[in-house]
Amino acid sequence: KGFVPDESNKLWVSDITYIDTLDGCCYLHLVTDAYSRKIVGWCLSETLHAAHTVKALKMAIDATGKGTLEGLIHHSDRGVQYCCDEYVNLLTDYHIKISMTENYNPTDNAIAERVNGTLKTEVIYREQRFTGFDDAERRIASFIDFYNDKRPHSSIGMKVPSQAHQESGEQRKCW
């Protein structure tokens, strides 16, 4: 609590959000860098199985190109996907510190919840409902590219996450 990263890959926040389609529900597993607000790992799935959460984490780890991530903190809620052996072992294998919310309180994982809200507001609620899983995956992938590379954020000085991800030092907030 209260930790403010001064560069990327110091604090990752993770969450899972429900995505409604005309065919039913699917689940978006996200890993976001708290410093840059860049979505560094994600997986859309038709189940809540931990394997999908692990896949999003592996994407984030692979994107760093590093064999160890000592000094990185991974923060999440206490969902079973984040507490399972496979997920915890992957974190510890890369020397990533584990942080979890104390109780179920969305404000304890506010950055992750904000990313969920932005995605839902700008893609899901604003546009036509997803027809099914494939449509959702295609449009979410497109939005994540837009979010990371073209959408300025007031919490990082009106820069885009991919730019902020390359920087260090305090991020100027514009709110």
Stretches with model-predicted labels:
Residues D33-A34, L44-H49:
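A short acidic/small-residue loop/turn micro-motif
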Residues S36-I39:
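Hydrophobic "anchor" residues
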Residues L48-A56:
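A short, well-structured alpha-helical segment
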Residues T92-I96, T118-W175:
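C-terminal domain-tail junction helix/linker
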Residues S76-R78, C84-V88, I98-K120, G132-R138, ...:
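RNase H-like two-metal-ion nuclease catalytic core shared by retroviral integrases
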Residues K1-S8, N105, V160-Q171:
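Basic, flexible linker segments flanking DNA-binding modules
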Residues K1-L30, K55-M59, A63-T64, L69-E70:
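Mobile-element integrase/transposase regions
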